[in-house]
Swiss-Prot record:
The keyword GTP-binding is assigned to this record: no
Described purpose of this protein according to its UniProt entry: Involved in pre-mRNA splicing.
Annotated protein name in UniProt: Pre-mRNA-processing protein 45
InterPro entries: SKI-int_prot_SKIP, SKI-int_prot_SKIP_SNW-dom
Gene this chain is encoded by: PRP45
Keywords assigned by UniProt, alphabetized: mRNA processing, mRNA splicing, Nucleus, Spliceosome
UniProt keyword Nucleus, yes or no: yes
GO cellular component: spliceosomal complex
Domain of life: Eukaryota
Species annotation: Candida albicans (strain SC5314 / ATCC MYA-2876) (Yeast)
Length: 286
């Protein structure tokens, strides 16, 4: 059949389907599911059930009121949509719960089995003159043995190593020392001492140690160095310096003259331009 019927329980409450709602995201779109509501008043029996018939090919009615243009989500904010929901997987829930519990409450269980050691008090009466109350306590403590519980927990792998790592050091091989000096001691003569004598560094400009040079040695040194004065080269140097000074002065003078000429030319062009503008303004007036 092309048409489908919808049952209305009461005349006051009517089930409404509207295209103003947004399209479902997780469902396929089928235009055959669109219905246009047709209202009908039941006058004979107000308590009887009414039927609202809709057809697939019926033309939608124009909205007669302003309320019909408002979306259902705004008109009925507490409207509950019974969309199909996937069933919950209990295995996934249990796994996630187990992981979260292990993160929030880390278990302090030992890695290996628990060991128990029985301990007895070796000194039942340590005090020589105890009180009667202390004697009773000591008797009860000595008679009752203690049991110590030993657990081995997992160590943190991020902790630094407890023991120092020794490198593979090789054994040091000590060889016999080879002496450069001759073992045969010889007596140093005066000639050898003079031959290996190194004089101190003495300068005419720098003498931090305060050494002095004898006059005889100074006079001997002056005789070997001839005193000469190169007058020709000194004359050439003085003439070259004077010529360079004159050339620099002439260059400065020429640069100043060229700069002054440029300034005068710019001033003349500026004055001519101003005069031309003034003449144009006078011509426009007359």
């Amino acid at each position: 059949m092309a048409s489908c019927n919808l049952l209305v329980i009461q005349t006051t409450s009517i089930i409404m389907f509207s295209s103003l709602l947004s399209r479902p995201v997780n469902s396929s779109y089928d235009p055959s599911y669109h219905f246009s509501p047709v209202t009908r008043e039941i006058k004979n029996d107000p308590t009887s059930n009414g039927v609202v018939s809709t057809t697939k090919n019926a033309t939608p009615l124009a909205p007669s009121k302003y309320d019909t243009t408002i979306p259902l989500k705004k008109r009925y904010p507490n409207l509950v949509h019974n969309f199909p929901k996937p069933e919950l997987d209990e295995n996934v829930i249990l796994e996630t719960k187990k992981i979260i519990d292990s993160i929030l409450n880390p278990s302090d269980e030992p890695t290996n089995d628990i060991n128990y050691i029985k301990y007895e008090n070796p000194n039942p009466n340590p005090n020589p003159n105890p009180n009667p109350n202390q004697e009773q306590q000591q008797q009860s403590s000595s008679s009752s043995s203690k049991i110590i519980q030993i657990k081995q927990f997992q160590e943190d792998p991020m902790l630094p190593p407890k023991f120092k790592l020794r490198k593979n050091r090789h054994e040091r091989i000590i060889e016999d020392v080879t002496f450069v000096k001759d073992l045969k001691t010889k007596k140093l003569t005066k000639e050898d001492r003079e031959f290996w004598n190194i004089p101190a560094a003495v300068s005419n400009w720098k003498n931090s140690q305060g050494f002095t040079i004898g006059l005889d040695k100074r006079m001997i040194g002056r005789e070997h160095v001839p005193i000469e004065m190169n007058i020709e080269k000194f004359n050439d140097l003085s003439t070259a310096l004077s010529d360079a000074d004159l050339q620099a002065r002439e260059d400065l003078k020429q640069r100043n003259e060229i700069r002054q000429q440029k300034q005068l030319q710019e001033k003349r062009l500026r004055d001519e331009k101003i005069k031309e503008i003034a003449n144009r303004s006078k011509r426009r007036r007359y």
